[in-house]
Amino acid sequence: MQELKRTPLYNIHLAAGAKMVEFGGWLMPVQYEGIIAEHQAVRSAAGLFDVSHMGEIQISGPTAREFVQRLVTNDISRLKPGCAIYSPMCNPQGGTVDDLLVYQLEDQQYLLVVNASNTDKDFHWIVSQQVPGVEIQNVSEVTCQLALQGPQAEKILQRLTAVDLSHIKSFCFVYGAVEGIHCLISRTGYTGEAGFELYFPASHAERVWQAIMATGATDGLRPVGLGARDTLRFEACLALYGHELTDDISPLMAGLGWTVKFNKPEFVGKEPLLKQKEAGTTYQLVGLEMIDRGIPRQGYAIFKEGQEVGWITSGTFAPTLGKNMGLGYVEIPFADVGKELNIMVRNKPLKARIVKKPFYKREV
C-alpha cells in the first residue's frame, strides 16, 4: 500500500488537535473543533485552510500560451500577467479531466492549480499533449498553498504585508512578502466568501501559518479542515471533482457553459461539446432541499412517480441554512425549480424540492 503524503503543516495540525483522515492520497485535517463551528467562523469572521495537497503545474516556453489555450476550455487569451481564470480541462470525448485555476505568471509562463486527487493524472495528461517550445513542471511538492477566507480575511492578512490588498481585484494576484516570506497573493477561494490564497515555498509553511493564526486570533480566526471546506463550497454550489464533475460529465452538463468558449479556434473536446450544445444535454445539475427528514448522499437515486430520473452528486446539512440540501443531476423534463421529487435514502423514498442555486451567496 502506498504511504499517505503529508503536507508541511502535518505536525501543526496534530498539535492543534485536528482529526486526520485520508483524502486523495494525503493525510489531511478533516476538522479541529468541529465542522459546524469552523463553517460558521468562515461565514462570520475568518478561517485558515491548509490546501497544500492541491497540485501546482507550471507551464512555460515560447509556445506556452497556445498550448494552455488548447488544453483548457476557457479563453486564456484574455489573461495578462497578474490575472487568473477558472476553467475545465476536457478529454477528447468532452468529459472533464479536471477543473482548475490558470494563473498567468509572466508573458509565456502559467501556473495551473489542480485538484489534489488528480495531480498525477493531470500531469501525465498534460505531458501527453506536450508540443515543442513548452516546458512542463510539477512543482506541487515544493509549494505550500494556504487559503484565508471570510469577511475578516483582508483585515487579518493586511497586518502581515506591505502590499495594499484592497487593490487586488477578484481573480487577480500580486507578489509580496507575508511575514517576510515571498508569496503569490491571490484574491480567489472556494468558500463563497471573500478571501485570499497564498502560494510560497513549502519550507516556510509553519512560519506563515503561525503568523496568520496569531495575527487573526482577536478577529475570530479559526483553523478549518476539509469537512467545513466541503460544506462551504457546497452551500455556494461550487463543483467538486469526483462529484459534480467527472471524466464522463461535461462542463455543459454541470452548468459551466460560461467557461466553454466555442469561439476559440481549437481546444481538446471542442467537437463533442459543440454537438452537445446543439443537441442539448439530457441532464441538468439542480439544487435540492429536503422536505422529509434525511440527508441525500452521493449516488442516491432520484425518482419522479416511480421513474428513476437522476442521481445525487453531493448532499449534507447546510449550516448557514439550517437545512438538509443536495446537488444532483436530473433529467431535463423534471428539472424545473419548484418541482417535487423523491430521493431514495436508505431504501426509503423521501420528498425533496428543486430550489435555486447557489444556496448561499455573500452579500456585497
From Swiss-Prot:
- Domain of life the protein comes from: Bacteria
Keyword annotations of the record: Aminotransferase, Transferase
Under InterPro entries, the record lists: GCS_T, GCS_T_bac, GCST_C, GCV_T_N, GcvT/YgfZ/DmdA, GcvT/YgfZ_C, TrmE/GcvT_dom1
The answer to whether the entry has keyword Transferase is yes
What reaction is this protein's catalytic activity? N(6)-[(R)-S(8)-aminomethyldihydrolipoyl]-L-lysyl-[protein] + (6S)-5,6,7,8-tetrahydrofolate = N(6)-[(R)-dihydrolipoyl]-L-lysyl-[protein] + (6R)-5,10-methylene-5,6,7,8-tetrahydrofolate + NH4(+)
One of the GO BP terms on file: glycine decarboxylation via glycine cleavage system
| Keyword set includes Transferase | yes
Gene3D superfamilies the record matches: Aminomethyltransferase beta-barrel domains, Aminomethyltransferase fragment, Probable tRNA modification gtpase trme, domain 1
Query: Example GO molecular function term?
Result: aminomethyltransferase activity
| EC number annotated for this UniProt entry | 2.1.2.10
The broad enzyme category this protein falls into is transferase
GO CC, sorted alphabetically, is: cytosol; glycine cleavage complex
Q: Pfam families from the xrefs?
A: GCV_T (PF01571), GCV_T_C (PF08669)
- Entry's PANTHER family? AMINOMETHYLTRANSFERASE, AMINOMETHYLTRANSFERASE, MITOCHONDRIAL
Query: Which HAMAP family does the record match to this protein?
Result: GcvT
Give the multimer and partner information: The glycine cleavage system is composed of four proteins: P, T, L and H.
Q: State the similarity comment.
A: Belongs to the GcvT family.
Role this protein plays: The glycine cleavage system catalyzes the degradation of glycine.
Report the protein name in the record. Aminomethyltransferase
- Which species? Desulforamulus reducens (strain ATCC BAA-1160 / DSM 100696 / MI-1)
